[in-house]
Every structure is written in structure tokens, then in C-alpha cells.
Amino acid sequence: MFKSLTIKSNKVKPREENDENKQDPDPSNQPQQSTRQGENKSENKSLQTKMTPVTFEESHAKMQDKISEKNSLRDLTTNPNHQHPTESKGAMSEQKEMETGKEGLVSPKSKPLGVPVINEYADAQLHNLVRRMRQRTMLYKKKLAEGDISSPEASPQTAKPTAVPSTQESNAKLKEEHYYHILCFKFQKMPLTEYLKRFRLPGSIDSYTDRLYLLWLLLVTIAYNWNCWLIPLRLVFPYQTPDNTHYWFITDITCDIIYLCDMLLIQPRLQFIKGGDIMVDSNELKRHYRSSTKFQLDVASVMPFDVFYLFFGFNPVFRMNRILKYTSFFEFNHHLESIMDKAYIYRVIRTTGYLLYTLHINACIYYWASDYEGIGSTKWVYNGEGNKYLRCYYWAVRTLITIGGLPEPQTSFEIVFQLLNFFSGVFVFSSLIGQMQDVIGAATANQNNFRISMDHTISYMNTYSIPKNVQNRVRTWYEYTWDSQRMLDESDLLCTLPVTMQLALTVDVNLSIISKVELFKGCDTQMIYDMLLRLKSTVYLPGDFVCKKGEIGKEMYIIKQGEVQVLGGSDGAQVLVTLKAGAVFGEISLLAGRGGNRRTANVIAHGFANLLTLDKKTLQEILVHYPDSEKLLMKKASVLLKKKAPATETTPPRKGLAFLFPPKQETPKIFKALLGGTGKAGLTRLLKLKREQTIQKTSENSEEGGGKRREYEDKEREPSEKILDSSECRANCIIAEEMPQSIRRAALPRGTTRQSLIISMAPSAEAGEEVLTIEVKEKAKQ
């Protein structure tokens, strides 16, 4: 222990001596250490010259740090076995440089002579801990300088880069690549892939609303009609020759391609309804199409019987199966009629086409029969002159329509053929004529109903001898109503539709008009929809009164078409304002109370006006289900009524010094009734009666007093009573003269000052008046 103390005392020596005692066992490192020691000496000298003066506490703390560093360095030199195996010579040299740098901050004169060690083991452990921490710090510093350090914790896995930026960059590059310049202008050319995306077929097709599908059906219908009309023609008439066979073949191949595309690409994508749900799944759509009869007919219509051309020649009979694709033709007719405004026109054209096609087939059969019998062999067959098709078609028209005038058949074949032709002609022609009648009748059904209604009305007016001017106005109303809306009552049309469809139609037609009404802004949307369903359309002729001044208002009017004029003025003929389409009037009458729902002006139709009306009863039925909207409407109605109320009369301006005196307030009505119209005299009389009642009450309470006191009071009151009686008599006379006959009976008689009075008021027979009644209560006899 003593040796350790003597060793520690050696640390008081200067830095240079201590460094000389430390020598590296490796002689090769001695020159390096000497050079470093020289550098440390020069640094210490420079630091000592530049050191600023410090306090005693700061110098003492620095000395303590230096002593601990010296102890750790002593352990390293005396116990080389405790050195960390991973420590390098470079780290030791850097540590020495740091220690020498710290020594330079303290002058040798300020170093303490020695510090006693209390516990050698604890001191050694602390020095060992400090040494290891410094070694580790130096190691990490070195790795940080080299850039090889990494966190001891596992770093999180980096997410895979998304392909969105790359695709966006690629799209931007593609767009830049497809720009081309012409002169000083820059144009963009869309790439081929963008064009192809436009023609990509959707996963499912709605056959009821998709117009592109309707165009496709038109193409399929054209191909179908080509086969229906020209296959029989080419089969019978000699119009297909070896010279033009390639043209017919190209057209046939085109029609077959259309058939195949429809069967493989379009039909398997058509949506259908299953259990009320619209099916859009591709597998389900394909399964449904393959299990339908339409698929079987489509497959039969594209069967490649054309291969028999190789064995039997180019004969159109092998293409007869193309006529089996009739389902697409009828589907096209159905969808086209559903989107046309006047579908009956197309129905007439289609029925006419059926008739022409029947005549076409009959003409082909007649030419085949003539060829079978021999052209020109008899008078009945075709003689071979003129255009073959036109002559045969003419014969078919005269035969089917049973016009007659044709040559008589000669052979049995001709007779049987003609009989069958007559029977089929009568059947086909009658059915087509009947169908044509149905089409035309359905197209004119509404007009027929209008004519029937108008005829019944005119018959009624003639029966009761209605004036001619009224009849003319009724006829005008019928004609204008039919010309404007093609029906007499719109509700008859809407009543056949469900409520949701009615609401959809009325919202599109009338919602923009009803939303302009200030009274209904802020109300429940569902309440507005219910109102739209209850609106009624009414047509007014020029000069008709929509409403008159003073009548009870029960309806609100919305101008749908036309104009109306509001009349007023002294004579009631001055046009105050002209209301046009979209204007609303009469809305206050729907919610006003008694006395506030009368019309304030005359409103007439300037021309033909179509108005939407909503009556008060209907609105009340609607508001039962919407209490919040009802409260809001009541508030708005009260505000609108106040705005439209007539302004109160303004008092004339005061002149002179009259503004210094406030205006005299009006006497309340109750006081006027009590006074009975006598003014101040009546008020004096009432006060006197009140005073007498109080005196009478006090006299009754003081009955215990002696009779002498009563006699004395009676004697004193006699002269006063005489004065009162005389004054009351004069007052009563004045009141009787001023009061009307109905109130004069209520005057009090004389000599009732000591009795109790009962004053009451009752309504008079005249409006706005009340009668004051005063009853005298008789005193009970003792």
C-alpha cells in the first residue's frame, strides 16, 4: 500500500518527465512517440500562453479530472494485461493526445502534491470502468469517421416501391413522344393503344338503355334482311351468274362475320334479370345465353353448310339457314319503338314491309312454277317477256289482293297452285289489313277520345240552349288544350304509372317552378315532392278571370305557360303588373286565417294561360305529416301578411310649439263603457257612489253605537242629503239626456245612497258596444 502511495506521488512531476518514463516495448515506435511528445510540448506551450485566468473552483475541478486521467494511465502502464484486446495503437496515441491537450489547460504550478486513496479496490474498478468507456468511445468515433457504423437494432424492411410513379412517368413520356410539329404549331397524336381502349367491349351490356347496342342490332338486321330478301331471289331467278359470283360471295361472308360477332361477342354480354336482380357477372351471362333458345337459333343460323359448294356448286339453297336469326330482327323492332316519339309511324312502315315481303315470296314462287311448267308454255305462266321480277311481282299483287283479270289456269298443277295462292292471299292480306287498322287506331286513339268528349259537351250545351258566345269559348278551350298538350287531363296519363315514376316526371317538369315560391323555401324536400304530385293543370282562355277581388281564396296558382294581369285602381281596370311564366300568386290564401284569405285584386288571363293549382285542403292534408314545415310556413305567412298589410295613417306634422306637449292619449274602452258616454260628469258620479258605498260599510260595522249618535248623525246628514239629492237630480237629468235609449234604463234612481250597489257589464245588441248595469241590493229587514 505504501508503494502505491509513493507511485501516486510521482504523478506530481511534470508531463515531460512522466512521458519519458513511458516507453513502448517495441523500439520501432520510439521515434513516433518522441515526435508526438515534441508536438504535445509545443501545444502545451501555446495553450499556456493563450490561457485565460480562471477561478479557484474551475482550476480545482480540472485538476481532479487530470488526476483521474493520470491514475487510469498509470494502470495501463503498470498492468498491461488489463488492456482491451481490440484496442489499437492508433487509439492509444489519440488517447495520449487528448490527455496532453487537457494538461495544457492547467499550469504546473497549480497541480496538487497528492491525493490519498481510501479504497484501492474501488479505485481500481472505477479506473477500469473509465478506461473501457473511453476505449469504446474511441472505437465508435473511429467507425463514425470511416462511415461503417450501423445501428445495433434491426432496421425495418423497406417497402417495395410502388409502380404508380413509374407508370405516370411512362404515360408522360408516351404523351411527349406522340407530339408532332407542323410549321409553328404543335399537335398531339393519340397512340394506337388509346384508340383501341375506346373500342374495348364492356363486361356487361344493358340492352334497354345502351344506344350502341341498338346500332349493332341495326347492323345485324341489315344482314338478316339481305339474306331474307336475296336468298330466295338468287335461288329462283337467274340473277346469279358465274361472272358476278365473287360479289355475292364477298357479301355473304360479310353477313356471316356479323352473325358470328353477334353470337360470340355481343349476346354473351347482355344483362338479364333473375329474381328481381340485374345480373352482370360474365360467367353468369354466358351461362344464361347458352341455355336459351336464342343461342340454339343463332348456332343453327351460322352452320357452315356452305362447304357443300365444293360438291354441288355455288347454290344459294345452302344458305337458307341464315333466315333462322329472326330473334335479333324482332328485338331491334322492339327497342326502336320504345325510343321513338311517334312509334306508330314505324309500325305502319314495318307492316307495309311485311306485305311487300309476302308479295316478294309469292313472286318468287310464281316464277318457280312458271319455270317448272315451262316459260311461255301456257297463258297462265310467265311468258318470258320484259323484266322477270317486275312481271312476276305484278302477278303476285293482283293474285293476293284478289283483283282478278288474270288468265285462267289450264293444267291441274296450275289450278292447285292458284287455289292455294288465293287462300293464302286472303288470309295474309286480311291479317295485314287488320294489323294496319290496329296500328292506325292506336295512333289516333287519344284524338278520338278528344273528339268524343267534345261532341258530348256540344250536345249538352245545345240541349240546355247555352248562349253561342259561351259555346264558342268552350270549343276554343277544347281546341287549345288538345293542340298544346295532346290530352285533356294530364292526371289520366300519370295515374297508370307507379308513384315513383309519377314523382320522377313531376320533378323534372315542375320542380324548377315550385322552388321559386318564397313561401316554400326551407321546407322539407319530401313535402315539396308530395305537393308536386298534387298539382293540377288548368287552362284559362284570354280574358278569363283567374280570381276576383273579395272572393274567398282557396287555391295557389303557378304560371306554367302564358301571362296573367293584375288589375286595380279606382275603376278596377288598371293593369298593375303582368305576371309571366314561373310567377306565383295567391300563396298567402293557403295559410291565412279567417278574414285574411280574401282576394285583394282581380287577376285575368292576358292570353291562353296554363296554370298549376294547389288548393288549401290538399295542402292541409300534406302538412299533417310535416309539423316542422307547418310551423315554418305559418311564420312565413305571418311575415308576408305584415308586409302586404296596408300602412297605418300617419299623424300630420305639428306646427309651432305644439311639439312641446305630448299628444293626448285615447281613453280606454273599458272606461268609456263604465262612463256610459257622459264624460267627466259620469266619472264624478261614479266616484261619489264609491264613496257612499264605503260610508255604508262603516256604518253597518258600527251598529253597536248608541241611538243618540245615530240621531245626531241623521240630523247632520239631512241638509247634506238635500244638497246631494238636488245635485243628483240635476246629474241624472243630464245623463238621461246624453245617454242613448239603450243605456238610459241603467240610470240609478234617487235615494239609493245607503244601499249596496252591484255594477256589471253586458254586451249590447249593437256591434262593438257594451251596457253598464247597476243594481241596488235591498237591505235585509232586521
Swiss-Prot record:
Site keyed Central gate: positions: F429, I433
Cytoplasmic topology ranges: 1-213, 266-294, 331-343, 441-782
SUPFAM superfamilies: cAMP-binding domain-like, Voltage-gated potassium channels
Source species: Canis lupus familiaris (Dog)
UniProt keyword annotation of Ubl conjugation present: no
Name the record gives this protein: Cyclic nucleotide-gated channel beta-3
Disorder association: Defects in CNGB3 are a cause of cone degeneration (cd). Cd is characterized by day-blindness and absence of retinal cone function. This autosomal recessive disorder occurs naturally in the Alaskan Malamute and German Shorthaired Pointer breeds.
Its job: Pore-forming subunit of the cone cyclic nucleotide-gated channel. Mediates cone photoresponses at bright light converting transient changes in intracellular cGMP levels into electrical signals. In the dark, cGMP levels are high and keep the channel open enabling a steady inward current carried by Na(+) and Ca(2+) ions that leads to membrane depolarization and neurotransmitter release from synaptic terminals.
Polar residues compositional bias, start-end: 74-83, 152-168
Localization of this protein: Cell membrane
Subunit structure: Forms heterotetrameric channels composed of CNGA3 and CNGB3 subunits with 3:1 stoichiometry.
Domains: entry comment: The cyclic nucleotide-binding domain (CNBD) comprises three helices and a beta-roll of eight beta-strands from CNGA3 and CNGB3 subunits. Upon cNMP binding transmits the conformational changes to the C-linker domain of the S6 helix to open the ion conduction pathway.
TM helices/strands, residue ranges: 214-237, 245-265, 295-312, 316-330, 344-366, 389-415, 416-440
